Curated annotation (Swiss-Prot):
Catalyzes the NADPH-dependent reduction of glutamyl-tRNA(Glu) to glutamate 1-semialdehyde (GSA). It comes from Prochlorococcus marinus (strain MIT 9215). Its EC number is 1.2.1.70. The active site is at residue 50. During catalysis, the active site Cys acts as a nucleophile attacking the alpha-carbonyl group of tRNA-bound glutamate with the formation of a thioester intermediate between enzyme and glutamate, and the concomitant release of tRNA(Glu). The thioester intermediate is finally reduced by direct hydride transfer from NADPH, to form the product GSA. Possesses an unusual extended V-shaped dimeric structure with each monomer consisting of three distinct domains arranged along a curved 'spinal' alpha-helix. The N-terminal catalytic domain specifically recognizes the glutamate moiety of the substrate. The second domain is the NADPH-binding domain, and the third C-terminal domain is responsible for dimerization. It is an enzyme of class 1 (oxidoreductase). Homodimer. Disulfide bonds: none annotated. The lineage of its organism: Bacteria, Bacillati, Cyanobacteriota, Cyanophyceae, Synechococcales. Keywords: Chlorophyll biosynthesis, NADP, Oxidoreductase, Porphyrin biosynthesis. InterPro entries: 4pyrrol_synth_GluRdtase (IPR000343), 4pyrrol_synth_GluRdtase_dimer (IPR015896), 4pyrrol_synth_GluRdtase_N (IPR015895), GluRdtase_CS (IPR018214), GluRdtase_dimer_dom_sf (IPR036453), GluRdtase_N_sf (IPR036343), NAD(P)-bd_dom_sf (IPR036291), Shikm_DH/Glu-tRNA_Rdtase (IPR006151). This is Glutamyl-tRNA reductase. Belongs to the glutamyl-tRNA reductase family. The record marks 99 as: Important for activity.
Length: 436
């Protein structure tokens, strides 16, 4: 069996490719079923965020397993394999384990140390378990990866003051507005007419960061107006006007800065919509939705400047040098956890031999116990029988303790193979299997 991961991220593919591979929550179950339908795939889990789509699998064969996942991704995205393959990354075995742990720790994020990815890995684990697409191997890997992410954040300073995609989006707005005014610094957003489209978690984070950067009023547009109103109630110090999506156009026309973060699978704003507004003021769009909420053609409008998640790199690079130094410490913790998982996984090779040995000894114990009890006659009480049975079980467990501990202990694969062969030969385990 082999652990593999196939996917795309902000490192390997632009947003126009990533958005076609994005798997929304309502499609996860169907996608997991499609992947499990491949005979090579034994366990599978999906991580889908604005910056990455990664499929982790336990496969019978690493090469055919990877090929199956690539086939699924090509069919799902509608991108022909020859165009998609250059954007895909593949990791096998130890590298796949290391990659997931680094992702969970925030070491592979656009924003080093960002905390949201950890909750997304937790969600991936939960969805895999709910859909019964994961088993003992991936469940163990996911659990340990989540623990690794927590450990990195608690034992290093990587997560201290870490920016997120949302905060980077706000900083990008500050930077671009400042540059228009001739500054290379982050300026206050106090004078901007701000519109936020969407009322999910990312929008909540956007509003939090907007408030900290001088914004004291904004318009919040969402398809479900009640959800927008509930979100607004969490910010009593801000003047938030809530509107339905049917009022989007008129609110764009009175805004100078628009943030979009919705779960829409198609753009909700395009050039045709903007041209109908007869804009006479400069307008900035910052779109952190994946798939994108804003069509790329809006950039053709003379009064519009539009940015997406790939443009956040300009802001992120300003803050990365300090975090790169802290990341070295975090990477050593991740490596320790990787070794622990791999040692556990390697020890599973001994399980069939251990189970066979235990089964054979248990059969002998029962046979010999029955012989002894039959000799004791009817005067031997039920309580005494229980005592003798407990005694025989204790003897078997004592006999098994040392060899089982040795077989499960950390050692190279070659050393474990030698140990397994010795045990099989001493107790004739392999010969019994052949005879059966």
């Amino acid at each position: 069996m082999h652990i593999v991961v196939v996917g795309v991220s902000h490192r390997t593919a632009p947003v126009e490719v990533r958005e076609k591979l994005s798997i929304p929550d309502h499609s996860i179950t169907e996608s997991l079923k499609a992947l499990k339908a491949f005979s090579e795939v034994l366990e599978v889990s999906i991580l889908s965020t604005c910056n990455r789509l990664e499929i982790y699998a336990l496969a019978k064969d690493k090469n055919t397993g990877i090929s199956s996942i690539k086939e699924f991704l090509s069919e799902y995205s509608g991108i022909i394999f020859e165009d998609l393959d250059p954007h895909l990354f593949c990791f096998r075995q130890e590298e796949a384990v290391l990659h997931l742990m680094k992702v969970s720790a925030g070491l592979d994020s656009l924003v080093l140390g960002e905390g949201q990815i950890l909750s997304q890995v937790k969600k991936m684990m939960r969805l895999g378990q709910e859909n019964q697409s994961t088993g003992p191997i991936l469940n163990r890997l996911l659990t340990q990866s989540v623990s690794t992410g927590k450990k990195v954040r608690s034992e290093t300073n990587l997560g201290t003051g870490a920016v997120s995609i949302s905060s980077a989006a706000v900083e990008l707005a500050q930077l671009k507005i400042g540059q228009e005014k001739g500054f290379d610094t982050l300026v206050s957003l106090e004078s901007e007419n701000v519109l936020v489209v969407g009322a999910g978690r990312m929008s909540r984070l956007l509003i939090t960061h907007l408030k900290s950067k001088g914004c004291h009023k904004l318009i919040l547009v969402n398809r479900n107006i009640d959800r927008a109103l509930n979100l607004a109630q969490d910010f009593p110090d801000l003047k938030i006007v809530c509107r339905g999506l049917n009022e989007l156009d008129e609110n764009i026309s009175i805004s100078s800065l628009v943030f979009t973060s919705t779960a829409s699978e198609v753009p909700i704003i395009d050039l045709a919509k903007i041209e109908k507004l007869n804009l006479n003021n400069k307008l900035k769009f910052i779109d952190i939705g994946v798939p994108r909420n804003i069509s790329n053609d809006v950039k053709q409008h003379e009064f519009v400047k539009s940015f997406d998640v790939d443009d956040l790199q300009e802001v992120v690079s300003r803050n990365q040098e300090f975090r790169q130094k802290i990341a070295k410490e975090a990477e050593s913790l991740v490596e320790e956890e990787r070794i622990i998982f791999l040692e556990w996984w390697a020890s599973l090779e001994a399980v069939p031999v251990i189970n066979k040995l235990r089964s054979d000894l248990e059969l002998i114990r029962k046979e010999e116990l029955q012989k002894a009890l039959s000799r004791m006659g009817p005067d031997f009480s039920a309580r005494e029988r229980k005592v003798v049975e407990a005694l025989t079980k204790g003897i078997i467990n004592k006999i098994l303790h040392t060899p089982v501990t040795k077989l499960r202990s950390p050692q190279s694969r070659e050393e474990r193979q030698v140990s397994l062969k010795i045990v099989e030969k001493l107790f004739s385990l392999a010969e019994e299997d052949k005879n059966n």
